[in-house]
Structure formats: C-alpha cells, structure tokens
Amino acid sequence: MKIGILAIQGSIVEHKNMLERLGVETVLVKKPEHLEIIDGIILPGGESTTFFTILENRLLFDALREKLVNGLPAMGTCAGLILLSSRIENHPDQKTLKVLDITVSRNAYGRQRESFSTYVKIPVIGDREYECIFIRAPQIVEIGRNVKVHATFNDRPIFVEENNILGLTFHPELTDDPRIHEYFLKRCSG
C-alpha cells in the first residue's frame, strides 16, 4: 500500500514519520501524476489559503478533486479539513474541494498562543481516550445528513467521516498514538 501526503506545506514530515512507523510506504504528492500511484492521501495541516493557491498553480486542484470524487480515500487534518469541506463560514467565495459536506469556521479555536490539547473518547478507534492537539484549529459548525460524527469536543464535531473522506479539526500526527492513522489505513485497504 502507498499513501500520498499532499506535500505543499504543513505537517508533512510528521504524517510521513507516523506512516513509516506503521510500515507504510509514502509518496509526497507534488504533481497530478503522483495521484495515479497511491491508495489514499493525507491532506495535512498548514495555512489553508496557501494550500489553495499552490494547488491551483501546480494543476493539482482539479486532478485531486476528480480522484476524491471517484473514491480515493482521504484524511484531512486542520487546514486539510478546510480544503476538503464544502463551505467556509464567512468566506463563501473561497474555493474548496467540496468533497465533505460540512461547513467550517477557520481558526475558530483561537490563535497560535491559544493552542491546546485535550483527551477525547473516539469509539471507532478503541476504548482508550485519544489526545487531540488543536493548533489554530477550524471548527465544524454544520454537517450534512450523510456525515458520521466520530468525536466531539464542547458539543462540536472534531472527527467526521463521509464515504471515503475523513476530516479532523486536530493534529493526530503530533501525538505518538497511531490509532487515527491505523483507522485511515483500514479505509484505504478496502
């Protein structure tokens, strides 16, 4: 199995290290042709506006969207979640991939200095609580009827799934706990 990591900016190395720890081959996705050799893709955290600009400059936006619409499993964390979303609150004209039926609010959990971590129960990955690290995190403010909510914090979804797409407002790659990545890998192997 080969998992792509959208290699534009953000926590690329941390996702790569986690996947390699799990014995998975990674591909740093920088060009549309890289999408042809992967079984799933991670869209890491970073700065969401930069993502959109670089994706379009590298002709990756349309190719990635087509792959996702046709079933390529994806996991978006933080800014990656924003990229996957259908709508951005207060930014209705900002382009997104529109493959996850949610509305997000950017940086809703505060600025960099207000970043935090907390432990949350996520039943789909086991009984033990999971450390969720929020860094300038988006908030999911609305979900479509086919979106499953796997975890919440303060009554807001923080981990959702719709068809082949997983979306997280937090950073699982910044922990030593591989369970979120393992859950994603199960989605990639059918």
Swiss-Prot record:
Pfam families associated with the record: SNO
GO terms of molecular function: glutaminase activity; pyridoxal 5'-phosphate synthase (glutamine hydrolysing) activity
KW Cell membrane (keyword) present: no
UniProt cross-references to Gene3D superfamilies, sorted A to Z: 3.40.50.880
Keyword Transferase listed: no
Swiss-Prot/TrEMBL catalytic activity: aldehydo-D-ribose 5-phosphate + D-glyceraldehyde 3-phosphate + L-glutamine = pyridoxal 5'-phosphate + L-glutamate + phosphate + 3 H2O + H(+); L-glutamine + H2O = L-glutamate + NH4(+)
Entry binding sites for L-glutamine: G46, E47, S48, R106, I135, R136
GO cellular component assignments: cytosol; glutaminase complex
Keywords, sorted A to Z: Glutamine amidotransferase, Hydrolase, Lyase, Pyridoxal phosphate
EC number: 4.3.3.6, 3.5.1.2
Pathway(s) where this gene product acts: Cofactor biosynthesis; pyridoxal 5'-phosphate biosynthesis
CDD domains reported in the protein's UniProt record: GATase1_PB
Biological process per Gene Ontology, one example term: pyridoxal phosphate biosynthetic process
Catalytic residues identified in the record: C78, H171, E173
PROSITE patterns from the UniProt entry: PDXT_SNO_1 (PS01236), PDXT_SNO_2 (PS51130)
Annotated function: Catalyzes the hydrolysis of glutamine to glutamate and ammonia as part of the biosynthesis of pyridoxal 5'-phosphate. The resulting ammonia molecule is channeled to the active site of PdxS.
The family this protein is said to belong to: Belongs to the glutaminase PdxT/SNO family.
Assembly with partners or alone: In the presence of PdxS, forms a dodecamer of heterodimers. Only shows activity in the heterodimer.
Protein name stated in the entry: Pyridoxal 5'-phosphate synthase subunit PdxT
Source species: Dictyoglomus thermophilum (strain ATCC 35947 / DSM 3960 / H-6-12)
